[in-house]
UniProtKB/Swiss-Prot annotation:
It comes from the Eukaryota. GO terms for molecular function: isomerase activity. Its EC number is 5.5.1.-. Keywords: Isomerase, Membrane, Transmembrane, Transmembrane helix. It is found in: Membrane. It comes from Acremonium sp. InterPro entries: DA_C (IPR054499). Pathway: Mycotoxin biosynthesis. This is Diels-Alderase ucsH. Diels-Alderase; part of the gene cluster that mediates the biosynthesis of UCS1025A, a member of the pyrrolizidinone family that acts as a strong telomerase inhibitor and displays potent antibacterial and antitumor properties. These compounds share a hemiaminal-containing pyrrolizidinone core fused with a gamma-lactone, giving a furopyrrolizidine that is connected to a decalin fragment. The polyketide synthase module (PKS) of the PKS-NRPS ucsA is responsible for the synthesis of the polyketide backbone via the condensation of an acetyl-CoA starter unit with 6 malonyl-CoA units.
Length: 409
């Protein structure tokens, strides 16, 4: 019998269950309801084989923007057309239902649907992370897209679901303090067919799906992030680098070759923004640690397209190395197009998503080329954060409602 979780737009729970267990079905809900700043989202992204088009969909249960008076059920759809134009739209829905139809052997599906009058967006994700399908039916957009996995599901420390099951172990779902996630479909082949305001968007490419949940709002748990997903020849690559509020970087990486994991790990390291205590603790930990893994994102400049805010990088070098295996994998990203962009109160903070190229492989071996989707975010701090939320409040008071997350170009 299916387990069902139902959430309405303005429903607030008195108490919630917050699961961090890797034994839970990959895409099933981890938060029983919304209380305070807890949030949960199902995130899908993609890029066409030619690197010109892309689709990003976020289905969230999130109180971060309740100041707008629109509830906690947000759906963001960001579309990049072949000619470089965009459709960025946010819907605030009335109800979200997630059904766990999985079995103990990871068969079955996790089904979700966000609805409002005349609107529905639904997903169906295989319990084992092998495939997913999304259907969109709104006045602006109608159609569907599918994903077929190229790599097995992965947890932040690099464990795959198959490894955990075969070894009878559990994994941590925590990427950084308060934020948890699982790469349900790290990389996949992608097929999309959407009609967006009368414009047909149909392409094949690569994509993936991440399920994330947290005990605090984005603005209070991380200073920002850099994430990428790409496929180059036989290699599938993901990297997620988040900086916590203490200035400590948590960088999770994954490299798969022809469906077989070659690297998976989490590196945590201090930065100049970190406290002296944190720097010392991490230094002593690393000195004692054997088999150290390195997961690094190094920005590059003057190679491609940059966003409008403070981070002017136009690409990155991703490097994954393991002291145990002695192997190093290196991939170069180049940003070629903007998928979407939001500014957060100043020119120094914002979020830019990119479509672009990736090339690389194992050091000393053949170099492969492909496509990648990535995004770079710097969240506002201090007075800038306060100013950002004051602007949202003024927009609501003055105009009744402004969809600040929506930009169409």
């Amino acid at each position: 019998m299916a387990r069902i979780n139902r959430q309405t737009a303005y429903q607030k729970a008195q108490e919630i269950e917050f699961s961090t267990s890797s034994a839970d079905p990959l895409a099933a809900w981890r938060i029983s309801g919304i209380k305070g700043t807890a949030w949960e989202q199902w995130y899908f992204d993609s890029i066409a084989d030619d690197g010109k088009s892309g689709i990003v969909l976020t289905m969230a249960r999130d109180a971060s923007y309740t100041v707008l008076g629109r509830g906690v059920l947000r759906v963001e759809l960001d579309v990049t057309f072949e000619d470089g134009s965009h459709h960025n739209h946010v819907d605030w829905m009335n109800e979200a239902i997630v059904e766990d139809r999985s079995s103990p052997k990871s068969t079955g599906t996790i089904d979700g649907v966000w609805t409002a009058p005349g609107k529905s967006i639904r997903f169906q994700i295989a319990a084992d992370g092998s495939a997913a399908k999304v259907e969109v039916d709104t006045p602006e957009t109608k159609g569907h897209f599918t994903l077929a996995a190229l790599s097995p599901p992965m947890y932040p420390n690099g464990e795959t679901q198959n490894e955990l099951e075969s070894q009878g172990k559990v994994a941590s779902t925590e990427l950084l303090p308060k934020i948890h996630l699982v790469q349900v479909i790290p990389t996949a082949t992608f097929e999309g067919d959407l009609m967006v305001n009368g414009r047909l968007l149909r392409f094949r490419g690569i994509g993936g799906h991440m399920h994330a949940w947290a005990q605090g709002a984005w603005f209070d748990t991380t200073l920002g992030w850099k994430v990428a997903r790409g496929v180059a020849g036989p290699f599938s690559v993901t990297l997620m680098e988040y900086t916590d509020m203490e200035g400590i970087v948590h960088s999770s990486g994954y490299v798969v070759e022809d469906g077989v994991k070659r690297f998976g790990g989490l590196e945590t390291y201090a930065t100049p923004r970190s406290s002296a205590t944190s720097q010392q603790v991490l230094k002593y930990r690393d000195e004692d640690r054997k088999g150290k893994q390195t997961v690094r994102w190094t920005p590059t400049y003057n190679t491609g397209f940059a966003g409008r805010f403070g981070d002017s990088s136009t690409g990155a070098i991703l490097q994954f190395s393991s002291a145990d295996s002695g192997e190093t994998y290196r991939f170069e990203l180049t940003h070629r197009r903007k998928a979407f962009e939001f500014l957060f109160g100043s020119s120094d903070s914002g979020l830019t998503a990119f479509l672009g190229e990736i090339k690389g492989g194992k050091i000393g071996s053949e170099v492969y080329e492909g496509v990648q989707a990535s995004n770079v975010c710097v969240l506002p701090q201090g007075w800038t954060k306060i100013y950002f939320f004051i602007c949202m409040l003024l927009a609501v008071v003055t105009f009744g409602y402004i969809n600040i997350l929506e930009t169409n170009t």
